[in-house]
Regions:
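Conserved, single-site charged/polar hotspot
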Residues: 1-305
Length: 305
């Protein structure tokens, strides 16, 4: 009953099989022991509404993979999460929750935009709405004056968002960059970790230095080796030669400074960007990949057995 509610029942068998193995592995990890049960029937765990939507294909996916789970280090993987769509790249769990070795960031060429409903999305907030939302979540920074992405990951997803208010400022990290915008009162939310604010700066903005984790956006006080072999200090932007192109360091997401009191967030994908993309699994299956290949692509270093 889980598979046809979590994934389109008419998708290729390999995608449905991958979903079945994910669901089975997920079920062995309890999420709600304090409430007296293991897993719930909603999107917080796995959607289950009985067998009404089951088909021969979804039943075959379950039967073909009977007893199989995803293993890491010889044990069932305890964080087999997935999302509807990653918007173009998965993310390292360390940049969203905490480090999980088999949940790593990688570009995803298998998601086909034209086949994904609401792949690209946008939502607009007023300064008053954001001020109220932040206050409800314990952040009293005064009237919101500015909001911007403070840091992107190497995959182009958001890892830090800064809110500047009339009294103070606050920077949130990880999954909070997405969830902090949720409001049932205003019926608004940010759908994924992959977005920009007011279109100021692309998700790929900035240059990653040395370890591919540190992004440089301001060059003031930075020392570099010039083409002439001299060490010089910079105070503005500069062009550098990367492995693939000439890029300008110092051009990242800049503060939005909304003139009309609104902030528009534009992004792609849906979910936390971790683990298997369900639409990506669909794309891989259509290209002839098996469910084992799909799972090993999205869960690095794991085995199915």
């Amino acid at each position: 009953g889980v598979v046809p509610y979590e994934m389109d029942k008419d998708w290729p068998l390999a995608a449905l099989e991958a979903q079945a193995v994910c669901a089975r592995t997920y079920a062995v990890k309890t999420r709600h022991p304090s409430l007296g049960f293991d897993v719930c029937a909603g999107t917080d765990c796995q959607v289950y509404y009985g067998r009404n939507r089951a088909t021969d294909m979804t039943d075959a996916a379950v039967d073909n993979t009977a007893g199989e789970m995803i293993y890491y280090g010889g044990k069932p993987a305890d964080t087999v999460v997935y999302c509807a769509s990653n918007g173009g790249a998965t993310e390292d769990a360390a940049n969203v929750w905490s480090s999980i070795p088999y949940l790593v960031g990688k570009k995803d060429p298998y998601e086909v935009k034209t086949n994904i409903p609401n792949y690209n999305w946008s939502v607009t907030y007023t300064a008053d709405e954001l001020t109220w939302i932040l206050e409800q979540k314990g952040y009293s920074i005064g009237t919101v004056k500015n909001v911007y992405v403070a840091e992107f990951t190497p995959m182009g997803n958001v890892s830090k968002v800064t809110f500047e208010g009339s009294r103070d400022s606050v920077t949130v990290k990880g999954e909070t960059c997405r969830t902090i915008f949720y409001s049932s009162t205003y019926n608004k939310s940010v759908k994924s970790q992959r977005f920009t604010i007011n279109g100021a700066g692309a998700a790929s903005g900035g240059i990653y230095i040395n370890d591919s984790n540190t992004v440089i956006r301001s060059l003031e006080g930075i020392s570099v080796l010039s083409g002439g072999g001299k060490t010089v200090r910079l105070d503005g932007s500069a062009s550098v030669l990367s492995a693939s192109e000439t890029s300008t360091v110092g051009e990242g997401q800049t503060p939005a400074f909304s003139k009309d009191g609104t902030f528009t967030i534009t992004g792609s994908g849906s979910g936390h960007n971790l683990g298997m993309s369900q639409y990506g699994a669909n794309g891989m299956a259509k290209e002839g990949n098996t469910y084992r290949e799909i799972l090993q692509h999205y869960y690095a270093g794991t085995a199915v057995g």
